[in-house]
From Swiss-Prot:
PROSITE patterns: ABC_TRANSPORTER_2. Belongs to the ABC transporter superfamily. It is a peripheral membrane protein. It catalyses: Ni(2+)(out) + ATP + H2O = Ni(2+)(in) + ADP + phosphate + H(+). Its main location: membrane. It comes from Staphylococcus aureus (strain MW2). This is Nickel import system ATP-binding protein NikD.
Length: 257
């Protein structure tokens, strides 16, 4: 079953040039779905379109848009409590002059009415999902944590609202290989053990082949290949996909990616 189903998504600039060219996209429930492609292919544009975060000089159209089986015209109403977003800029998500416990409980209470005790309970649960303990985090400031720890706290700040869908745009791009793999292990655990749905935009082929169940390949604004992981391991692939998998290099990113 798909959590998001969008048909004929097109994104244009003010000159009416199509940057995303009529793609059909399904994000399957309780799976890690991936979108991969070269620099400038438009990967992050798709994520921004789903969340209505497109720059003002770009516009999008589509024939139909469903979320959790219901027709929708805007997803902004779901952002935060039903749809979470993880970016690579985790260090900018917390200020340096407020303890993390206060910031995390404020995130929960912004979306849900509840007592401080209830918020702390939700924060404690979210931190446990990313293998952190409240006693080690709540009384600290962001600058006191390592990059890997802060990334986990950032993920916990999304999980505290218990969203059905998490959109992750290059979530480990700014981490070293070891911390990046640890974070991907955590995201996989969250999907498998807690029933979350993940849509990840990444240029890391190794992560895609190791962690993802369903994959889209984007080239010049068009999806040229799609399928489950077995398709990409055992089937005859598009020459472009073959080249990506052959080299398995981390593809460069630009302004739009």
């Amino acid at each position: 079953m798909s959590l998001i189903d969008i048909q004929n998504l097109t994104i244009k600039n003010t000159s009416e040039k199509s940057l995303i060219k009529g793609i059909d996209l399904k994000i399957f429930s309780q799976q890690i779905n991936a979108l991969i492609g070269e620099s400038g292919a438009g990967k992050s544009l798709i994520a921004k379109a789903l969340l209505e975060y497109l720059p003002f000089d770009l516009s999008c159209t589509y024939d139909s848009y469903q979320f959790d089986g219901e027709n929708v015209s805007r997803l902004s109403q779901y952002y935060g409590h039903t749809i979470g977003y993880i970016s690579q800029n985790y260090a900018e998500s917390f200020n340096d002059h407020t303890k993390l416990g206060k910031q995390l409980t404020a995130i929960y209470r912004k979306h849900y009415k509840g007592s401080k005790e209830e918020a702390l309970s939700k924060v404690d649960k979210a931190l446990s999902w990313v293998n952190l303990q409240s006693k080690d985090i709540l009384n600290k400031y962001s600058f006191q944590l390592s990059g890997g720890q802060l990334e986990r706290v950032y993920i916990a700040s999304v999980l505290v609202l218990e969203p059905k869908l998490i959109i992750a745009d290059e979530p480990v791009a700014s981490l070293d290989a070891l911390n990046g793999n640890q974070v991907m292990d955590l995201l996989q655990h969250i999907v498998l053990e807690h029933g979350q749905t993940l849509f990840i935009i990444t240029h890391n082929l190794s992560h895609v082949l190791k962690y993802c169940q369903y994959i889209y390949v984007l080239k010049e604004g068009q999806i040229i290949e799609r399928g489950n992981i077995n398709h990409f391991k055992y089937e005859h692939l598009h020459p472009y996909t073959e080249r990506l998998i052959k080299y398995r290099t981390q593809l460069k990113r630009d302004y739009y990616d």
